[in-house]
Structures are given as C-alpha cells and as structure tokens.
C-alpha cells in the first residue's frame, strides 16, 4: 500500500465528489496522503495506513444522508469493529428442513413386498380445522367436469373415427401379418397405424381443449351472475382492524433484473401500503441473487435511495446472497430460515409486481378470517408495456383471463393454484411443510426444482391447508414480456420446470387435484409436440393415400372390398365443434364486457374489433409457439441446457437479425412443408395454410409486433385498451413516474463506481458481509486480489474476481485507497468516463472549477 505524497489535483478531485461545504474541503485540502485524509475523516489514527479507508466509511456515508441514517440508527459496528449498514433486521433463525423426495413407486412397492416399511406419510397439521363443506362441493364439481370432458371427447373421437378413410382394422389378421413379407405388411398396416395414432392424439388434444372450454364457461356464469357463496374474498368485510401479531413480510426475490423498474414498483407498493395507515404491520425485503457486479452496486444505491425518499429505513430491507443455492426457492428458504419466525404471513412479489395497499391489507384480513387457508393467490392484471405484442397480450389476459381464473376457482375452490407471486402465504405451515429438497437422481429432471410454485401449493394442501384464488380482488399487477422471443425465453424455463414437476405425480400423500395440476402443467407444453406430430401424421396419411394403392382385400377369401370412405358432413360438424370450443370463451368474454360496461375497454365497437384482431394474431402465433414448445420439450428430454442468451434491447424491440436467427428454421419448415403438400394434393393445402402460412410469416410478425411505435399508435386508436390504461390506478401511475425518475438517475458501471467513487465505495463497503477474520492466508488472499485488480485494471477482471472484491469490505476499501493514492489511470479514467456519460448532469463537477480553468 502506497502512502506517498498525494497530488493536489487528485486530492481536490476526490474532495469534489464528497458532499461537503467549501470550508470543509479547505480544511482537508492540506492532507499529505490519502491515508491522512481518511484518518481525519474518521477522526482516528492507524499504525497501518491500509485500514484508514475502511475506517472512514461511516463518515463518507453520513455526509449526504446524516439525518436519515442517524434517525434510523442504520450505521452499526460489526464483530470486527467495522462500520456496516443495518440493511436487514436481526437474525432469529428458524428450522427449515426439506423432506427428501421418494418419487419411485416401484421402490415403495418393493419395500412393501419385502417387509420393509416405507417412511410414513407426512402428517397433517393438528391445528387445521375440520373439513369444510366446500371440500365435498369441490369434489362433486370436479367429477362433473371429468364426465363433461370425457363425454365430449368420446363423442368427438367417434366422429373423428368416422371421418377416417380406412375402417377395416377388424379385418386385419395379425397372425397372418406376422408371416408375410415385411413390405406387404407395411402396405396393409401403415394406413391403419397412422389413423390410430392420429385418433389417439386427437383424443388427448380435444380433451385438453374441452377442459379449457368448461373452465371458461363456468367462469363466465360466475362473473355474470356474481353469485358465488364460496368466494374467498367474501370472508372479510374489508374494514376489520389488522391485529398487531399479524405481521406480514413482503419479499421480492430478484436476480439481475432491471433495477430502476424493480425499485420503482417497490416504492409504489410501499407508499400505497403507507397510505392505508397499516404500514406498521408490514416489512419489505428485497432478496437479491444477482451476480452481475454492476447490477449489484446499482441495487445497493437504489435501495438507499428508496429508503431515503420514501422514509423506508427500518421497513425496507435489502440482502444479497453470496451462495446462490436452489435459485428462487432457495432464496425464499434463506429468508424463512433467518427471519420467517418474525412474521405470521408472507407476500411474495415478482420483480415486476406492483400491489396496492388495499389489496395487501385485504389479503391479510382474508387470512385472519379464514384460519384454514394456507395460501391465497390473487389474479394479477397485466399492464405497463407499450409494444404492440405486449399490448395485445395485456388485452387478452385482461379480457379472457378473468373467465379462466373464475372458472379455476369454481372447479378447485380451496385446492387451487399458486403462481409463485402476488399471493399471501401463512408462514408457519410454509416453513414446516413447503421447503423443497432437490429431486433425486441424475439428468435433466433432477436437482433443484425450477417451477417451485405448483409444488409448494401441493405440499401446503397435503398438510391440510387450503389454497385459494381470490379472483375478484383488485389491486394486483404484473408485467408481460415485451415481445415474442422474450416470452419464449421464459417459456423454455417454465417448460423444463413443469416437466420436472411431473416426477412428483405419484409422491405419497398428494391430493388428487394437485396431481391433476402437475398433469395440466405438463400438458401446457406437451400439447405442442402432440399437435405438431398430429399434423405430421396427417401429412403422412395424405402421402399414403396419394402414393400408395389402397388395399381393398386384407384377408384371404374376403368377399367384399374395403373402400376408403369420406364423410364431409362429419368433418364439417367436428371442425365446427372444435372452433366453438376454441373461440366461444373469447366471445363470452366480450359479451360479459358488453353487459358490465365497455367504456374502459374503448367502447363496444373497439373492444370487439380488438378481440377480432387479437384472434387473428393468436392464430398467426399459435404454430410458431407450437414449434418452439416442441423444441423445448425435446431439449428437456435430451438434457440440453435451458439457456438462451438474448441480447439486451433498450426499446424492447426485436432486431431483424435476431428474428432471422430464431425464426429462420421455422420459415424454411413452413415453405418446404407447403411444397410437399402441393406436390401430394394441392387441395389439401387449404386445410394447412393456417399452419404453414404462419410459419412462413413468423419473421416479420415477430419483428413488427415488437415495435413500441405500433403499440402506442394502437393505444391512441383505443385498440387493445384495458382499464389500467384508460384510468390508471395510483399504484401504477406512481410506478411509471418512479421508473422514469430512476432511469434518469440510474447508476451505470456500478463496479467501477464502487471501487473509485468515494460515496459508492463507502456504501459498498458498509453492505459487504465478509465474515473473514484475521488470518494469514486470508490476508495474503486479500493482498493478491488487490494487487491483481491494480495490475489488470477494471477491464481485466472477470466477474468472479469482481464479486470477491465486492463481497469483502476490507479488500474493497484497500483497493479504493490505493487507486487514488497511486493515481492508477485505468481505474480513474474509467470512472471519469462513466460519470461524464451519465444522462443527467453530475451532482458535482469532475474537478473543482479552479482546476478546470488551468491549462492541461
């Protein structure tokens, strides 16, 4: 560590970036070294100059926020006597022990046969109330749903069988088939094998469509009549005082997110809760798993800013994990282990979530009024995006979504879904029963559970607690991906997670409803390859009919030929029925809006036109999603990594180059598929045009729909308008305002700032949580890290090196002092360039005015 004579220009530049008065700067301008400067700032003297910068952390912090930090008693001394920021409450550990999964039913059966006992089924909580009437009602409703789905599917399957050209399976003699030449066997059997495969896939897909239809239909009736005596939101009058012991933690797990937007939503939610007068019942936690050092530093500054501006010190907490275990579920486990015992309830927020104070206080009251509820999930409303694609998706979820969520509630009641965010959770049963162990084994479907929400809901229900959807509770919001490719990137992760969850289908003690939830989660993505192979087999059957001579006689001494049949009346009836099942829910949604008032959707004409345009757009995108989801499913089974490095885009639009890269293979597939069908039978192309045409148009559709300009123009024309745009609630208005302000003051090049900038370094040192004590190997490692950072400069450090420095307050303070004391140009120039590139004017000049006037 150098303690040489300091250059006056460098010292003046350093002091210029500390919020001091001119008199204070003048007092410090005579320091002979940076070690002396830090000693005078800290009012301490040190034998080793290496510790002086660490000691001045507290003084550098309170120069700009003295009153707020002192009033909230935010600065404390850690076990080593270093100044640290009290960014989290005191730890009071709670035992969180995940139960190992036993997913192999064969192993359980073998243990039973050999006389060895299996582990007992996890007991239900003794304090859960006796089974309520809604559970019997829910079971009866689901049996009715099963009958409706299967009945509809059987009738449709019978019609589909009658449409098939070959009706002679009963004449195929399997014994004779096995003794005849292979080519002859293939000629006879191939058409029937294709038909049978098509029929099976059709049955599965039609049953899936039928489930959605009946769910939407019952949701329509629920919303139209407004009569639902099992509605969870009716359990509370909405004005009961919240008991003092009903403390609630709002936790927001984040990982390398858009920092300005995250903390804008957090501040809007915080201020909305404060406006209710019940802020003393809530605490807010930002739980960061970020590993990008620039983002980490930006998060720290954003947390300090929101605490200062919203007066959130002691109510808004921030923690960044150093050991990123089990992703989001592990982040929540760590929170529960450290602070879960301090709270009765927990509300989980996504990085883009916004919730109103009225919604949050209502959730707490509902939990208090429903003592057997373990989770109450809200129905988040999508808003806040401006691209054409996102606005159409927002419109679809806002118009059609309420039917499906109300329908889910009708069929499931208190054995429903949990979507992982914008929901309130009862802490004690969650800690006792919902910790997630890794899935056993090796391969793509083992390890940490990706889609934790469905599993946590299933475990909560297994323990005897209810899981409800408060589908009619307003004030819960989220954002959707801005374009198709970003949505597909998210879908790949969800696809892998849902396929992993299906391993839990036969785990002991799971409620049948949640086994069905695991199945529907798989079908959400498995339906894509089923549909794709259904189309491929249909094309193959067309090729067989065109290229192969029909086999009219399938067995010896057959008197009458088997003629291929065609029943256009049945085909039209089946096609019409399928169209009704697919599109009637959308029409019912519009009818419901007409009945309740369409003004906030742009009026009856505009909302109807928007629905028609959205239907056309969804038809264009359905085959594109089919191909991608098919690829995702195959990738998961083949063990390919679920990653997709998509470039960052400031305007959320998709460049043509990326669209060609992602959609190019689909375009070629659609083109050659169309040529094949034209060669086989041109008349069949009309049936396949919606598929191959969509694939060939995927590139321009993906690019054009990602444009912000088209989205804003459609809003000006009142197309795809939603109530949150027509009359924005205060929480969303505040989020937009704070996002704009945060972007204007966003911190760029965070790691360089944390090393060089006097205040950013002080903040980073105060929030670093290195537990290393005094030991020779540790000291040697610190010296090596600082020496390496000085040698290679900011551009030469990899992300691991940066994280190690950012997590060690001693090494970070030493690096800061040495960069300034020795005038290392690589670090100082990078910092100066970063400050100069800020979109807003710097708070302080890079150099004092007197120095700026001097010639170089």
Curated annotation (Swiss-Prot):
Cellular component, GO, one term: plasma membrane
Species this chain originates from: Pseudomonas fluorescens (strain Pf0-1)
EC id: 2.4.1.-
Domain of life: Bacteria
Pathway stated in the Swiss-Prot or TrEMBL entry: Glycan metabolism; osmoregulated periplasmic glucan (OPG) biosynthesis
Record key words, sorted: Cell inner membrane, Cell membrane, Glycosyltransferase, Membrane, Transferase, Transmembrane, Transmembrane helix
Cited SUPFAM superfamilies: Nucleotide-diphospho-sugar transferases
Family: Belongs to the glycosyltransferase 2 family. OpgH subfamily.
Pfam families: Glycos_transf_2
PANTHER family: CELLULOSE SYNTHASE CATALYTIC SUBUNIT A [UDP-FORMING], GLUCANS BIOSYNTHESIS GLUCOSYLTRANSFERASE H
Biological process annotations from GO: glucan biosynthetic process
Record's bilayer topology term: Multi-pass membrane protein
Membrane-spanning segments: 144-164, 198-218, 517-537, 574-594, 608-628, 691-711
A GO MF label: hexosyltransferase activity
InterPro entries attached to this UniProt entry: Glucans_biosynth_gluTrFase_H, Glyco_trans_2-like, Glycosyltr_2/OpgH_subfam, Nucleotide-diphossugar_trans
Localization per Swiss-Prot or TrEMBL: Cell inner membrane
Protein name in UniProt: Glucans biosynthesis glucosyltransferase H
CDD domains, A to Z: Glucan_BSP_MdoH
Described function: Involved in the biosynthesis of osmoregulated periplasmic glucans (OPGs).
Keyword check for Cell inner membrane: yes
